[in-house]
Amino acid sequence: MSLLKNVGTIGGLTAVSRVFGFVRDILVARVLGATPMGDAWQLAFMLPNIFRRLFAEGAFASAFVPLFNRRMVEGQSEAQRFAESVLSVLLPILIVFGGLAMVAMPWVVAYFAPEGLESDPEALPIAVMMARITFPYLLFMSLATLVAAVLNSLSRFAAAAAAPILLNLCLIVALIYGASLGEGVMARRESAFWQSVALSLSGLLQLVWLAFWMHRAGFRIRMVLPRISPGVKELGILIVPAVFGAGIYQISRFVDLFFLSTLEVGSYTYLAMADRWNQLPLGIIGIALGTAILPALSRYLSREENEEAQRLQSNAIELAMLLTVPAAAALFVSGSAFTRVFFAGGAFSLEDAMITGTVVSGLVIGLPAYVLIKVLTPNFFARKDTRTPVYTAAFSLVVTVGLNIALVPRLGVLALAVAGSIGAWCNVAMLYVILARRGFFRLPARIAGRIARIFVAALVMGVTLWFLMQPLDPWFGGTTLQRTGGIAAVTLTGAAVYGIAAILLGVLDRATIARLMRRQT
């Protein structure tokens, strides 16, 4: 399939999941709000997900896919033995790590808990209990990541892209039940408890779902006795630096947790809710592109088809910018409109929504950079180079932490968003310079010119939306009809202006679409 079709498959299913995710977040805002129990749930939800994205999705997939593809060239039986040996070692590690985390959870939660939660003698033990309930999600999703990596290597992208829908459905059911309990502290506590149970259950369901489709694809991974094979050793060597290279975003989240613990109650919720808007295009575009190009790059480089690898990388960057730059511009200008329309109500006040909207604007400054990291790092991983992204990630992290120290006392939670965005752009700059100096990739002047025109088209759209936001501002906090009309006007106007500007500037034409639709082999 072509890059555009693969990204469309992954991104389309991810978009469905994100829609359910927004329904989930609206319910979370209405049921829990920016309260101590809301922060407790966000912390219990963040902890296993940070480890999942850091070790399972980012590091594991980046190291596993090139090694698996190399063995697929030798034959499926060789690839199957490799996957089985990896599973035999991965499962005991996950069990031991999960057990240690369960024991240490009171100290972990107390360390990361915000001041208002830490000082609450009743809320803190509940937060610890919730975190323990949610942590098995890491075990299930790490195993699911192994199965998903196999499916993606076989170019079966749909099943893995659809799996997160199960997560959101489980949480929505739990939240609907929580909403039926009424208002008050006790109702919020019970709702948060059932959300924790639903999270772990969703991990098990996703694992079963992916295993079913792997079997349908004719691939089996059997349980065998643990054995440190040469392939497992090589995978382990690649994973350690990949944790930092592919997981810089998640490492930054640990930094965020530390600084959030120094801020007022509600800050966890503000950042989490704002990040949902940042994650929407990042998940649909960035993760889809990174997932789609890694197997293809691995195949091209194993066959020494360097020109095809260069073409694929250029197309991926152009497509990433074509989609993320306007999304970032639109959310930067109108982020507060979206947070007021979708989140304000119930336990989540209009002031909470306005603060969240400000954080959205800070986060999306780095949206194109986060996507470019997803697009550029596979070029290293496909060459089995997981060390170089370590250095760029470390530099980016130093920049982020330094900015947090300087800005958090002045800007509060907004500083975390801005610092992370600037750090991400530093990461992108270093990744590209290193690729260019090593002769692995250099962006063609033609593509660079098109990207410049993309920024111009997005700027035209952003200015238009800025003028539109002022007369529509009262609508975003008005009746349901006014909110719907206001957000529809912003969305449709932004899409129309960007589309027209892109066509007039030559960003979108038939030749570009045909090039992006070209089949990968």
Which residues make up each language-model segment?
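Membrane-embedded alpha-helical bundles of multi-pass transporters/translocases
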Residues: M1-T521
